[in-house]
Amino acid sequence: MDKIRIIGGGSLNGTIPISGAKNAALPLMIAALLSEEKLVLENVPRLADVALLQRILGNHGVDITVNGKRNGDDPHAGQTMEIDARVIVDTTAPYDLVSRMRASFWVVGPLLARMGEARVSLPGGCAIGTRPVDFHLDALRALGADIDIDAGYVVARAPHGLTGARIVFPKVSVGATHTAIMAAALAKGDTVIENAAREPEIVDLADCLIKMGARIEGAGTSTIEISGVPRLRGARHSVLPDRIETGTYAMATAMTGGDVTLAGARADLLESALDVLRKAGAQIDVNNEGIRVRRNGAGIFPVEVSTAPHPGFPTDLQAQLMALMTRAQGRSRITETIFENRFMHVQELARLGANIHLEGDTAIVEGSDRLKGAPVMATDLRASVSLVIAGLAAEGETMIQRVYHLDRGFERLEEKLSRCGAQIERISG
């Protein structure tokens, strides 16, 4: 099993190209199931989760062609993917594939809307909280689907098609909002989704579907209105830049006291996180090239942050911020409001010398001017990259095990960091 070895203590300086967003690419790939024509996606990141979804879509009979080669540090050099879902040969998404990634459950909406049926295994993925699929299923029921749970599979049927309806989510859910939008796009009549997620990835999905002929208004607000259409056509769409990768490298730069330009990044996608970084002492400059992050000489200031649905501070940057705050000049408080059990990185950060204690859903971080390298183990995607950030600032060697988590969400991480001066390498084993 691969490991990552880091010799910490240096600063990051240079340019890091920001990849296409995984959290946008996955629903966009799934949206191809809604059309008999080709969907061409540009700037698709090369990630384990993307490759797994290619296998899942292939299981349904979807033909996927990947073109384009990486072109140096061009921030728009992600792969181009042609997805042809003209022929659906199977509406079952099996356990052995879906159990490995929760987002793959989202195929249920498009398959049901287009084919009138779907049989999808209950999902797997990161071990952070329960993430129930109830909101997805309630939305599909509201649109007229019959839903049964049989031997670990969701069996959804709508032999006469779906019908527009009012969907009210009791709690904001990004995944369920994706499902509702895709299913409603082909439903008969009008659908109103209330308490919808407002994340940029929701907007990106809606923008792509509109290019395909969908009639959607309000994406990016809490109320989305959709007028169903009989069919969707093919389209070409570029995946938006990854705001979580952007925030991660911005925090790594602040942690090490460097000067890095995040090429291709969009500040409007993560304003809350950038505001927190400014409060922590980082200098943030936005220009035509992307976002420049600096912290030269000044200390790191403690902050108090609660995660929240967009436009609040993203839960997917909580672990990275905690790593940064281990070096702050004082006490920080970080409250997790989105997922339960998302503090599994605390114990591993403590192995590097971090002083963190938990009070319910809040982590109290006592900053220190010293971390020391040690062997640590990644527990999930975001926790693993928080250990990378801490390792970059720690004295001596940090060895991170179970780095397959990183490959799910960060493209060429070691290469991008090493080009900015980090002493980081992958050790195969």
Curated annotation (Swiss-Prot):
The protein's annotated pathway: Cell wall biogenesis; peptidoglycan biosynthesis
Keyword hit for Calcium: no
Enzyme nomenclature, EC number: 2.5.1.7
Major subcellular location class: cytoplasm
Binding site for UDP-N-acetyl-alpha-D-glucosamine: R102, K171, V172, S173, V174, D316, I338
Transmembrane region(s): none
InterPro entries documented for this protein: Enolpyruvate_Tfrase_dom, Enolpyruvate_Tfrase_sf, MurA_subfamily, RNA3'P_cycl/enolpyr_Trfase_a/b, UDP_GlcNAc_COvinyl_MurA
Name recorded for this polypeptide: UDP-N-acetylglucosamine 1-carboxyvinyltransferase
Organism for this UniProt entry: Azorhizobium caulinodans (strain ATCC 43989 / DSM 5975 / JCM 20966 / LMG 6465 / NBRC 14845 / NCIMB 13405 / ORS 571)
